[in-house]
């Protein structure tokens, strides 16, 4: 774990060893294997925040919601939720969690490598979107890497086989893929990451 000083243009090593997840929301959180650490600015050290009990658990991503629940994605054990008073639950019990996204309505969208897309509503109910070959309006693949909400409230979802736009009002997914005959379209159908800038423009990274 390294810190880069923009003024001095120098790096400072804060923590040795592998770091599996990094997240910032008021504080800097990192995941190392089955442990979550929080950076203590006053001491310059990383303090242990939580240890996930179990075998072969490796964290993949972190997210802190407005209720101070810490959501922890893993590489093979699904999704855990740690409340502010350190009560642990496991809303998703299996799968490799690629990313966690919170939209403007405070719903969570959980992207997975093989289990499709999970939607965790504010009432804690969970919906799982999977590809259905018989339904052209379903998500195009179960290998979901990232998602991002646009200014109109639509959710853009990056998968191994294309970009999906999900409209909450209709519950339908629209697919966008690369087409050599459309020079103004996607250059590659495999979408790795998505982000929205301050002007509302959606940026895509392909792989």
Protein language model regions, located:
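Carboxylate-rich, polar loop motifs that coordinate divalent cations or form catalytic acidic clusters
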Residues: 1-207
């Amino acid at each position: 774990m390294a810190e880069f000083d923009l003024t001095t243009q120098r790096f400072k090593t804060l923590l040795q060893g592998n770091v599996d997840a990094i997240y910032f929301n008021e504080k800097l959180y990192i995941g190392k294997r089955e442990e979550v650490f929080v950076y203590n600015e006053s001491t310059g050290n990383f303090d242990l925040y939580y240890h996930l009990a179990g075998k072969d658990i490796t964290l993949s991503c972190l997210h802190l919601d407005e209720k101070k629940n810490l959501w922890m994605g893993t590489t093979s054990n699904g999704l855990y939720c740690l409340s502010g008073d350190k009560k642990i639950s496991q809303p998703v019990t299996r799968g490799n969690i690629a990313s966690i996204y919170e939209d403007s309505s405070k719903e969570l969208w959980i992207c997975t490598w093989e289990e499709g897309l999970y939607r965790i509503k504010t009432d804690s109910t969970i919906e799982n979107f999977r590809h259905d070959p018989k339904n052209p309006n379903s998500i195009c693949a179960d290998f979901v890497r990232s998602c991002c909400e646009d200014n109109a409230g639509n959710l853009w979802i990056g998968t191994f086989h294309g970009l999906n736009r999900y409209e909450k009002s209709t519950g339908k997914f629209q697919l966008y893929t690369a087409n050599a005959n459309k020079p103004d379209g996607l250059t590659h159908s495999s979408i790795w990451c998505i982000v929205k800038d301050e002007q509302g423009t959606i940026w895509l990274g392909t792989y």
